[in-house]
Amino acid sequence: MVDLEAAQRRYSGGAILLHWTIALALGFQLALGFSMPKDESGFALYQLHKSVGITILLLSLARLAWRLTHRPPPAVEGGFQGFLAKAVHTLLYVFMIGMPLTGWAVVSTSPIEVPTVFWGAIPWPHLPLPGSLNGAAEETHELLAWIGLALIVLHVAGVGVAVGVALGAASSGTRARSGACSWTAS
């Protein structure tokens, strides 16, 4: 027999799959972005970075569409904690979509015209932006990387708090409100 109440407290399998696929891709992408050489010796890594970035953009748009068409489980926390969780989740969506878009803007405004070929197979167009925006696009892309890193740390810390609440409730024999951790797929 299916426990409908428990099922309503969990994210769907699709949401969980998108969450962890994007999380792993973001971790890889941030590590790659911070470690890539800034000269022509990193050409292959830049191509990989662009393909991973486009993939993150497409997956994030799919995740946003999923979120808009599938009801998430009820919020675990209220008050300031609930506000903070909602703010971090919203900003993570801005990051997951904004970061690839600013990267696309960097490539599109670069004085070095190198075509982008998605995973070496699909030509990817450049945005019709003036080259004068390149410096601002690069600075914004780098700033978003640091902001995204901070948001990820806040998100993981929030999950730690939620799991702690759930474990505390379980050890005391009480029920955690709304299932404190449904394996994070917000």
Could you describe each region identified by the protein language model?
Residues 1-186:
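Membrane-embedded alpha-helical bundles that constitute the cytochrome b-like, heme-associated redox core
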